[in-house]
Amino acid sequence: MDEARGGPDKKKERGPKRPRKVSPTYLENAALHYLKRYAATKSQLQRVLLRRVDRSIKFHGGERGEALAWVEALVAKLVRNGLLNDEAYAQMKAHSLRASGRSTRVIAQKLRLKGVPAEVVAKKVADATHEVSEEDAARIWARKKRLGPFRTQPGTREENRKRDLAALARAGFSFGIAKKVIDSNPA
C-alpha cells in the first residue's frame, strides 16, 4: 500500500531490488522480454544478458563461465529461430537513419557500435544510399535543423554560413555537399 492510500511505501523500506539468480530459463525469459520491446543485434543482446549475469553473480555468487555458455547457447538458439537477425536490423536502422537525414558516415558508425559485422554495414549503407542520396540526406538534415536556406530568418543566412557549414560537417557530410546545400535556394 502506498502513502496516498494511507499506508507506508514498502519500496522505500525494502531498499534496492535484489537481482534474480541466473538460470537458462531466466536468461531466455529476459531475452524474449527484451526482444519484445527493442530490435537488437546479437552483440547488443549479449551485452544486456551479460550485465544481468554480472549483477546476479555479484549478489548471489556463482560461476561466470557457466553463465557465459548459457548466454552463447541462447543467442545461437534465437538466431536459429529467426528472432535475432543482424542483417534485418541493419537494413531497418540504415533506412530509418537515412530517411531522417543522417550521413553515410553516421549510419555506418551507429551500426558498427551496435555490433553489426562490417560487410553487412557496407551492404546496407549502400542500399540506403540508393534510395536517398547523400545530398538529399544533407538537405533533410538542414531542413530539420533550420540551416542555410531553411533558416526562419532569411536575413541572417549569410552571417551564419560558416556555422551552418560546420553543423553539416559535424553531422558527417563532406564539405562539398554541405556547401552545395547551404548555398542553395530554398525548395
From Swiss-Prot:
Keywords: Cytoplasm. Its main location: cytoplasm. Pfam families: RecX_HTH2 (PF02631). The keyword ATP-binding does not apply. The keyword Ribonucleoprotein does not apply. Gene3D superfamilies: Winged helix-like DNA-binding domain superfamily/Winged helix DNA-binding domain (1.10.10.10). Residues 1-23 are annotated as: Disordered. Residues 1-12 have a biased composition (Basic and acidic residues). Modulates RecA activity. This is Regulatory protein RecX. It comes from Myxococcus xanthus (strain DK1622). The gene is recX.
